[in-house]
C-alpha cells in the first residue's frame, strides 16, 4: 500500500495540475497494519455508461483530499472530458457548500451535526444524503523513537483533555505517567491536533474526550499530514490523524477501552468488528431530493467509488474498503 502524501497541500486544486501537486509530496507511507488489507471479492467492476459530462465540485474534509484525488483521476480515465475540482478546508465547510450550491459533493470525516442537518432541511425541506465511502481508523501517532506500547482511552483523554470525562485520576503531562520508566518517561508530552473546522477534531472530541474540552496546550495543525509531520519531528510528541497518513517516522499506538482490557491495533479487522475504539466511516454528503435520482455525473462518480476499482484506491490511499453488502444497500439510495 503506497501513496504520495502531500505536505502543506493547498486547499483547492483542479485535476489539470494534480501531477504537479503529487510531485510536491515527499513522504511515502507504510502499510497501516501488519495484516494485508483485503478487498471484498464480491465487489463489482465499474461499467462505463454514455452521456456522462460536465463538472463536479467538492468542498469539505481535508482527510479525504488525497482519496478524492485518486478517485477523480480514475473517473477521468473513464470520462476524459469530466472536470473535478476539490477543496479541502475541513468537514465543517461541507454543509454550507451544499446548502449554498457551491459544491455537488460534501466530503466529511464525521457525520453532520443536528444543527447542520437542520440548516439544510430549512432550505430544501428534506435532509442531506450521507454516503459512506471508506473506513478509517483514527490513529494516535507518536514518534518512532517513543517506546510507549499502548494507551487506555482514559489515559488518552487525560493527555488531550482538561475535562477528563473518561475518569482518569490525574492530568497526564509526562510520559512516565503512561507507564514509561526509562529516561524518556521524564519528558513532557507535546500534544498535536487539528483545528475546530476539522471533522477529525470533532470526531476525536466526541469519542476520545467524550465531548470534553481540549487542553490549551494542544498545538492545532491545519491538516492531517501536518499533525503526523509535527509528531515525526518531535520525539515527545503525540497527535491524532487518519490512518492513511502513516509514515516511517511515526508509530501508531494501540488503544484499550479500559484498564486491563487488551490493546487493539488500528487494523482492518479491528475496525470491521468495532473493537478498535476510534474507527469511523468517511462520508460524501449529497443533495438528493426524495424520489428523484442524482445527477448522472454524481451518480456515476459514486458508483465508481463503490466499484472494485474505486475501493482498490481506498486501499492504495491507506484506508480500509467497504464490504459489498453495505455498498449494495447504499447504491439503492442513488436512484
Q: Predicted segment positions?
A:
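Flexible loop/hinge segments at secondary-structure junctions
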Residues: 32-335
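Glycine-centered signal
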Residues: 3, 30-31
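Generic short amphipathic/hydrophobic targeting helices enriched at N-termini
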Residues: 1-2, 15, 48
Amino acid at each position: 500500500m503506497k501513496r504520495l502524501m502531500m505536505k502543506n497541500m493547498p486547499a483547492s486544486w483542479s485535476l489539470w495540475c494534480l501531477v504537479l501537486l503529487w510531485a510536491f509530496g515527499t513522504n511515502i507511507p507504510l502499510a497501516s497494519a501488519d495484516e494485508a488489507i483485503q478487498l471484498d471479492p464480491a465487489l463489482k467492476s465499474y461499467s462505463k455508461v454514455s452521456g456522462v459530462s460536465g463538472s463536479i465540485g467538492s468542498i469539505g474534509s481535508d482527510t479525504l483530499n488525497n482519496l478524492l484525488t485518486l478517485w477523480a483521476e480514475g473517473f477521468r480515465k473513464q470520462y476524459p472530458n469530466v472536470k473535478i475540482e476539490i477543496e479541502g478546508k475541513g468537514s465543517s465547510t461541507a454543509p454550507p457548500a451544499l446548502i449554498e450550491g457551491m459544491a455537488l459533493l460534501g466530503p466529511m470525516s464525521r457525520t453532520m451535526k443536528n444543527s447542520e442537518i437542520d440548516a439544510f432541511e430549512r432550505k430544501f425541506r428534506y435532509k442531506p444524503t450521507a454516503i459512506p465511502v471508506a473506513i478509517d481508523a483514527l490513529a494516535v501517532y507518536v514518534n518512532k523513537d517513543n517506546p510507549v506500547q499502548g494507551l487506555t482511552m482514559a489515559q488518552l483523554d487525560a493527555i488531550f483533555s482538561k475535562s477528563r470525562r473518561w475518569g482518569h485520576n490525574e492530568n497526564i503531562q509526562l510520559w512516565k505517567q503512561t507507564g514509561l520508566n526509562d529516561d524518556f518517561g521524564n519528558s513532557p508530552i507535546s500534544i498535536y491536533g487539528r483545528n475546530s473546522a476539522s471533522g477529525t477534531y470533532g470526531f476525536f472530541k466526541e469519542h476520545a474526550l467524550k465531548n470534553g474540552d481540549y487542553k490549551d496546550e494542544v498545538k492545532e495543525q491545519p491538516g492531517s499530514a501536518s499533525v503526523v509531520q509535527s509528531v515525526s519531528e518531535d520525539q515527545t510528541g503525540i497527535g491524532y490523524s487518519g490512518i492513511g497518513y502513516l509514515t516511517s517516522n511515526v508509530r501508531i499506538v494501540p488503544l484499550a477501552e479500559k484498564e486491563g482490557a487488551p490493546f487493539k491495533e488500528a487494523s482492518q479487522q479491528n475496525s470491521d468488528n468495532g473493537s478498535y475504539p476510534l474507527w469511523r466511516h468517511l462520508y460524501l454528503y449529497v443533495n438528493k431530493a426524495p424520489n428523484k435520482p442524482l445527477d448522472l455525473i454524481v451518480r456515476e462518480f459514486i458508483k465508481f467509488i463503490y466499484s472494485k476499482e474505486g475501493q482498490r484506491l481506498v486501499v492504495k490511499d491507506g484506508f480500509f474498503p467497504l464490504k459489498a453488502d453495505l455498498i449494495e444497500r447504499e447504491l439503492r439510495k442513488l436512484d
